[in-house]
Amino acid sequence: MEQFEAINVEQAYSRWKDGSAALVDIRDPQSFEAGHTPGAFHLTNASLQTFMQQNDFERPVMVMCYHGNSSRSAAQYLLHQGFDAVYSIDGGFEAWARQYPQDVETSA
């Protein structure tokens, strides 16, 4: 995969539920703490190396942001770091929380 692929929240939810892809959330710390998908890795500049060390580059990665815009550049960046398949979630966390409110947790 040379270019990331955009997927909708239904596709992302299915992959998240069956565990076939890693989920990273690139929103700011306050937004992440206020609500995020269970098991999502909070990916920041500071946590990037940890994520890369802990994850198999052959396992698909889904990138979530606020609305599905910022995730596109982050997805492309992860591809350039060597991940085989990276997906940007259209609609981002806002769409996820609207469609799957039961699958949102807080850090508080």
Curated annotation (Swiss-Prot):
EC number of this enzyme: 2.8.1.1
Tagged with keyword Transferase: yes
GO MF annotations, alphabetized: thiosulfate-cyanide sulfurtransferase activity
Source superkingdom: Bacteria
Pfam families: Rhodanese
Catalysed reactions listed for this entry: thiosulfate + hydrogen cyanide = thiocyanate + sulfite + 2 H(+); thiosulfate + [thioredoxin]-dithiol = [thioredoxin]-disulfide + hydrogen sulfide + sulfite + 2 H(+)
Stored InterPro entries: GlpE_sulfurtransferase, Rhodanese-like_dom, Rhodanese-like_dom_sf, Thiosulf_sulfurTrfase
UniProt GO cellular component terms: cytoplasm
Main localization (coarse): cytoplasm
Location in or out of the cell: Cytoplasm
One of the GO BP terms on file: glycerol metabolic process
Active site: 65 (cysteine persulfide intermediate)
Keywords annotated in UniProt: Cytoplasm, Transferase
Coiled-coil regions listed in the entry: none
Rhodanese domain mapped to chain residues: 17-105
HAMAP family referenced in this protein's UniProt entry, alphabetically: Thiosulf_sulfurtr (MF_01009)
Family the UniProt entry places it in: Belongs to the GlpE family.
Role according to the record: Transferase that catalyzes the transfer of sulfur from thiosulfate to thiophilic acceptors such as cyanide or dithiols. May function in a CysM-independent thiosulfate assimilation pathway by catalyzing the conversion of thiosulfate to sulfite, which can then be used for L-cysteine biosynthesis.
The protein's name: Thiosulfate sulfurtransferase GlpE
Source organism of this protein record: Serratia proteamaculans (strain 568)
Gene: glpE
